């Protein structure tokens, strides 16, 4: 499908903006989550973004202009319990886009890259993820289930999706790489760096 996107972009006068947003989350302790649910989260959250970003970059680097945006998560900067596959995949998206940014600076400076790291956003991701996995519930132990329930509660209390959309539009105007719609994500990332510097545990 890379070739198809490139051909379509050329037929339409070129691809100017590409926003990659893919996510499923199936919480639980890492040793309780079945491997097929690990695989699903990595496939959608990481490989889905890789395919989209790579196809967009092929088209954009040919023209020398464009802006590719990938939506990661606050979980791409700060880890939390009960979300190991999701956290791993979202960290991978951040690493991908940082590498892409370095590459574009050297090979195609007219093409911009941004990574979006939202905190909790009020979406039906939890319900949709169960449907994609084809299960009614995670089938977790009680301690693991309590963490999963807390994840869902946090999502339900999250910000509006419009918050993320507005931040992406701002980034397209400014060319900013790091896009953190909610300040608590930056605070969490700063705390992580300080813990690394101090040699303290997460």
Residue ranges and their predicted role:
Residues 8-18, 26:
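A glycine-rich helix->loop->beta "capping" turn
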Residues 18-19, 68:
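Conserved hydrophobic beta-strands of the Rossmann-like cofactor-binding core
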């Amino acid at each position: 499908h890379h070739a198809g996107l490139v051909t379509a972009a050329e037929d339409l006068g070129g691809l100017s903006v590409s926003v990659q947003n893919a996510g499923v989350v199936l919480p639980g302790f890492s040793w309780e989550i079945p491997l097929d649910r690990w695989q699903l989260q990595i496939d959608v959250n990481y490989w889905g973004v890789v395919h989209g970003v790579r196809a967009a970059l092929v088209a954009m680097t040919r023209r020398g202009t464009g802006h590719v945006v990938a939506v990661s998560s606050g979980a791409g900067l700060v880890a939390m319990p009960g979300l190991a596959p999701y956290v791993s995949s979202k960290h991978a998206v951040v690493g991908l886009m940082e590498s892409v940014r370095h590459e574009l600076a050297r090979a195609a400076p007219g093409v911009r890259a941004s990574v979006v790291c939202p905190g909790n956003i009020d979406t039906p991701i939890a319900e949709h993820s169960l449907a994609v996995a084809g299960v009614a519930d995670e089938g977790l132990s009680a301690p693991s289930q309590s963490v999963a329930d807390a994840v869902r509660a946090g999502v339900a209390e999250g910000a509006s999706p419009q918050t993320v959309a507005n931040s992406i539009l701002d980034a397209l105007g400014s060319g900013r790489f790091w896009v953190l719609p909610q300040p608590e994500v930056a605070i969490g990332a700063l705390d992580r760096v300080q813990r690394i510097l101090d040699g303290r545990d997460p």
